Amino acid sequence: QSRALLEMTDIRFQQRNYVEAQGFYSRYNQSARQNARSLWLGVQLARIFDQQDEAASYALLLKNIFPASAEYKAYLDSAR
């Protein structure tokens, strides 16, 4: 179930349906452990909804837990 929630988050995000993406992401967060992909989605959604503290928290987790991931590299590129 948690994988399906993350997939739906990503699909809605790609469709620019950010409100639904946020809803799926919230449900995902309640049921699953974070991975690099979910943290990067969390950063992007938090930025869209101007939740700076949340974006920073997800970014820090991404940096500390998945520093070699493609998602962390994408985060670094987006911060430039």
Model features per residue range: what roles?
Residues 7, 41-44:
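"A position-specific structural signal for the A-helix of alpha-solenoid helical repeats
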